[in-house]
């Protein structure tokens, strides 16, 4: 698990749009948020374009029902074009996305935060290059590192700031990734429960899940309560 430091990493976070959003899981409100970071030096192991040192970050929130009276279900989902849109079976991303939307709909309330961190933060083209390396026998972590990136370049400050902007201070977080729990807690948002987002494994991504568990610390057993 990575260590997160408290602090406001953005000069501003603003709501840019809001609209009705019917889906096959039910009606949501869809919100668009834009975060502008304070000046900082980009991490060379996570930057595909050093000239773009401080680009605005965009994120979408799907909100269903009353999320203010009790700690809501929250899912932080990182964009995965290949899985979420094309149904790739190299990963479990689409299955996790659909599980989150279905769970929120069954609960009648919750928040899905969809952020643009394709390929665990390295971007779409490097992600496809990593696929090619995986075809040659490297695993998902080794492929990222072979390309000069960290195993996981994602940071989760923007979801935390959006939750605070929405007045959310406690959540039931749907994740298998301890880093997401740590990021929210370090931002002052209490994770009262970790809800599992484990999906049924398939042969095509069984190794991928094993690597996430063994090398990245992801949790593959059932959910638990968190009071940290």
Model-derived segments and spans:
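Catalytic domains of riboflavin
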Residues: 1-228
């Amino acid at each position: 698990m990575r260590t997160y430091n408290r602090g406001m990493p953005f000069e501003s976070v603003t709501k840019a749009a809001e609209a009705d959003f019917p889906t096959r899981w039910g009606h949501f409100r869809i919100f668009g948020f834009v975060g502008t970071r304070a000046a900082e030096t980009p991490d060379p192991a996570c930057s595909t374009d050093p000239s773009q040192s401080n680009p605005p970050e965009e994120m979408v929130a799907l909100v269903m029902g009353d999320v203010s009276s009790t700690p809501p279900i929250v899912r932080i989902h990182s964009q995965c074009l290949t899985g979420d849109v094309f149904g790739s079976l190299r990963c479990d991303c689409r299955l996790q996305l659909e599980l989150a939307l279905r769970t929120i709909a069954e609960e009648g309330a919750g928040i899905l935060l969809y952020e643009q961190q394709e390929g665990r933060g390295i971007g779409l083209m490097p992600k496809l290059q990593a696929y090619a390396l995986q075809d040659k026998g490297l695993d998902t972590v080794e492929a990222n590192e072979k390309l000069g990136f960290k195993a996981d370049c994602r940071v989760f400050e923007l979801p935390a700031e959006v939750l605070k902007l929405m007045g959310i201070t406690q959540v039931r977080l749907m994740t298998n990734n301890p880093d997401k729990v740590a990021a929210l807690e370090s931002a002052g948002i209490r994770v009262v429960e970790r809800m599992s987002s484990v999906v049924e494994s398939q042969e095509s991504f069984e190794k991928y899940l094993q690597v996430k568990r063994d090398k990245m610390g992801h949790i593959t057993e059932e959910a638990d309560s968190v009071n940290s």
